Amino acid sequence: FKNLNFNEQSLILQGDATVSSTGRLTNVVDNGEPRTSSLGRAFYSAPIWDKPTGRLASWREKIQEPNKAGPADGMAFALVPVGSEPKDKGAGLLGLFDEYDSNRHPVAVEFDTCYNLEHDPKERHSIRSIATPRWDFPNGENAEVLITYDEELQLLVASLVYPGERPYYLPSDRVEIEDELPEYVIPGFSATRGLNEGETHDVLSWSFASKMPDEQESEGLDLAE
């Protein structure tokens, strides 16, 4: 299955997220400028985990994300429960978390354009990160991202590269996702922007493939290419 543009029928759009005529999934902007205090989320509508069997699908994501203005606050690839709604609009919470607590949270990989030790130290079971490599992005350039999860190894790996540039950024960690998430989850993106900083968060293309441990990998789903 392929789409040349993002297919709204296969996506759950929340908050300020829109599908534009250029095939980009973006936060809403006013008069061409990034909107302040903005939150947008978009998720694929089909769940990827069948808890009764104890099996989790593997996935791959390829994202291209430009940064056209000053840094803040970032966007994240996330797995959220089916029926999840946008959370606290505080920009540092990425639209995925209600507050800094130790309750069960989504599993997310954040592309943080505003490095802040208060929000970015290593710590499990919270908004705080379990792996935090620095990301010195060239402003306005497109980044390509690959995210993989191996259910057998319980290993989550994310890599980011600008074409023709180095280095790769390779955070990884062992995550027992079946212990962190409920029975049904959906994959997608969430992005926020604060009151003062200015940037937009665009997903230019997104491909998705998954398989159960005992099955052959699916051909793949290009939600936009």
Curated annotation (Swiss-Prot):
The keyword Transcription does not apply. It comes from the Eukaryota. Keywords: Lectin. Belongs to the leguminous lectin family. This is Lectin. PROSITE patterns: LECTIN_LEGUME_BETA. Homotetramer. GO terms for molecular function: carbohydrate binding. Chitin-binding lectin. Agglutinates rabbit erythrocytes, but not human erythrocytes. InterPro entries: ConA-like_dom_sf, L-lectin, Lectin_legB_Mn/Ca_BS, Legume_lectin_dom, Leguminous_Lectin.
